[in-house]
């Protein structure tokens, strides 16, 4: 067996010595590839390499289409299955080759190319990030999209802050108590239509609360009850009247007027119904006195089933 191994190992022996001592082959290798010139001295083979050298040739001849990596996997599995007695001659041969290599190349130091490969892989993975940093188009587009989304969210959150930012948060309480569903038409373009109405209602609410908060505090229950008794299609206004009654006794006037003026904006059919009696949201602030006249008109008429008519102050008539 040793003779067979020596015959197989004789061709690489002169190649290693010629690679280290022969000037022609070293010069040709250095001229062809200067980066690999210091790595021309190969490492001494270990026991597995000594054994797998002949086995690899056999397996490659038997399976010419098999990839080299698959051959290495199979050879590694077979090497693990070998016993120590079977591995012993290859281990001894590997020791002999290592001693010979140390004699021929006493100043040899193993420089693993694995580190350079891993660095190249890291550079490949980090290269797109580095390229994206100086390029302004992709970053600007990403920032623009993020800013646009952030602006839309901020606008919507601002409108919700106007809705729920009033004192005691009674609007959210009333919305939870009523629990009526929204119109399906508001799902797609509801947010775009609700924002100008919210902002207009805030200014109109401030105007109304400054001029006649007392009238709205006393008139809103009767006003909502009269709407519910006229046979309107939305039956939620009747429950809204009772809720507004309880809200009016415990909350300040501004909260009651806000709950009354904000509730019709929640559903599309309610908004269309109220537009027959009140001016639309596009009308400027001078439409607020007409709302007061409408509420006074409903206050003057008797409302059956309610005892609020006798207690309403009619000093403004």
Swiss-Prot record:
Compartment(s) of residence: Nucleus speckle; Cytoplasm; Nucleus
Disulfide bonding pattern of the chain: none
Keyword flag Zinc-finger: no
CDD domains named in the record: HMG-box_SoxB (cd01388)
Effect of residue 74 to P: In MCOPS3; uncertain significance
One annotated GO biological process: regulation of DNA-templated transcription
Transmembrane among keywords: no
Entry GO CC: chromatin; cytoplasm; cytosol; nuclear speck; nucleoplasm; nucleus; transcription regulator complex
InterPro entries: HMG_box_dom, HMG_box_dom_sf, SOX_fam, SRY-related_HMG-box_TF-like
Entry GO MF terms: DNA binding; DNA-binding transcription activator activity, RNA polymerase II-specific; DNA-binding transcription factor activity; DNA-binding transcription factor activity, RNA polymerase II-specific; miRNA binding; RNA polymerase II cis-regulatory region sequence-specific DNA binding; sequence-specific DNA binding; transcription cis-regulatory region binding
Disordered as annotated region, ranges: 1-43, 243-266, 297-317
Residue positions, PTM Phosphoserine: 251
Location in chain, cross-link Glycyl lysine isopeptide (Lys-Gly) (interchain with G-Cter in SUMO): 245
Reported modifications of this chain: Sumoylation inhibits binding on DNA and negatively regulates the FGF4 transactivation. Methylation at Lys-42 and Lys-117 is necessary for the regulation of SOX2 proteasomal degradation.
Low complexity bias: start-end ranges: 246-261
Domain writeup: The 9aaTAD motif is a transactivation domain present in a large number of yeast and animal transcription factors.
Disease tied to this protein: Microphthalmia, syndromic, 3: A disease characterized by the rare association of malformations including uni- or bilateral anophthalmia or microphthalmia, and esophageal atresia with trachoesophageal fistula. Microphthalmia is a disorder of eye formation, ranging from small size of a single eye to complete bilateral absence of ocular tissues (anophthalmia). In many cases, microphthalmia/anophthalmia occurs in association with syndromes that include non-ocular abnormalities.
Functional note: Transcription factor that forms a trimeric complex with OCT4 on DNA and controls the expression of a number of genes involved in embryonic development such as YES1, FGF4, UTF1 and ZFP206. Binds to the proximal enhancer region of NANOG. Critical for early embryogenesis and for embryonic stem cell pluripotency. Downstream SRRT target that mediates the promotion of neural stem cell self-renewal. Keeps neural cells undifferentiated by counteracting the activity of proneural proteins and suppresses neuronal differentiation. May function as a switch in neuronal development.
Subunit structure of this chain's protein: Interacts with ZSCAN10. Interacts with SOX3 and FGFR1. Interacts with GLIS1. Interacts with POU5F1; binds synergistically with POU5F1 to DNA. Interacts with DDX56. Interacts with L3MBTL3 and DCAF5; the interaction requires methylation at Lys-42 and is necessary to target SOX2 for ubiquitination by the CRL4-DCAF5 E3 ubiquitin ligase complex. Interacts with RCOR1/CoREST. Interacts with PHF20L1; the interaction requires methylation at Lys-42 and Lys-117 and protects SOX2 from degradation. Interacts with TRIM26; this interaction prevents ubiquitination by WWP2.
Protein name according to UniProt: Transcription factor SOX-2
Lineage, highest ranks first: Eukaryota, Metazoa, Chordata, Craniata, Vertebrata
Gene that specifies this protein: SOX2
């Amino acid at each position: 067996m040793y003779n067979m191994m020596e015959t197989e190992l004789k061709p690489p022996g002169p190649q290693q010595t010629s690679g280290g001592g022969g000037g022609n082959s070293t010069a040709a290798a250095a001229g062809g590839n200067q980066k690999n010139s210091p790595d021309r001295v190969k490492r001494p083979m270990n026991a597995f390499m000594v054994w797998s050298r002949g086995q690899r040739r056999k397996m490659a001849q038997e399976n010419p289409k098999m990839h080299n990596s698959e051959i290495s996997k199979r050879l590694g599995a077979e090497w693990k299955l070998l016993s120590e007695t079977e591995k012993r001659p290859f281990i001894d041969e590997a020791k002999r080759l290592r001693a010979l290599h140390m004699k021929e190349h006493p100043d040899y130091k193993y420089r693993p190319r694995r580190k350079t490969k891993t660095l190249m892989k890291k550079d490949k993975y980090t290269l797109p990030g580095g390229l994206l940093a100086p390029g302004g188009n992709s970053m600007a587009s990403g920032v623009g999209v993020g800013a646009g989304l952030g602006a839309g969210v901020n606008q919507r959150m601002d409108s919700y802050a106007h809705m729920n930012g009033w004192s005691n948060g009674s609007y959210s309480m009333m919305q939870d108590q009523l629990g009526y569903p929204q119109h399906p038409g508001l799902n797609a373009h509801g947010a775009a239509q609700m924002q100008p109405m919210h902002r207009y209602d805030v200014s109109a609410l401030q105007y109304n609360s400054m001029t006649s908060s007392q009238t709205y505090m006393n008139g809103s229950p009767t006003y909502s009850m009269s709407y519910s008794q006229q046979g309107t299609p939305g039956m939620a206004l009747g429950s809204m009247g009772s809720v507004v009654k309880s809200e009016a006794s415990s909350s300040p006037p501004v909260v009651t007027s806000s709950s009354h003026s904000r509730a019709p904006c929640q559903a599309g059919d309610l908004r269309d119904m109220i537009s027959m009696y009140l001016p639309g949201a596009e009308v400027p602030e001078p439409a607020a006195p007409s709302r007061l006249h409408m509420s006074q008109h409903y206050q003057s008429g008797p409302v059956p089933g309610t005892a609020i008519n006798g207690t309403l102050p009619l000093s403004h008539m």
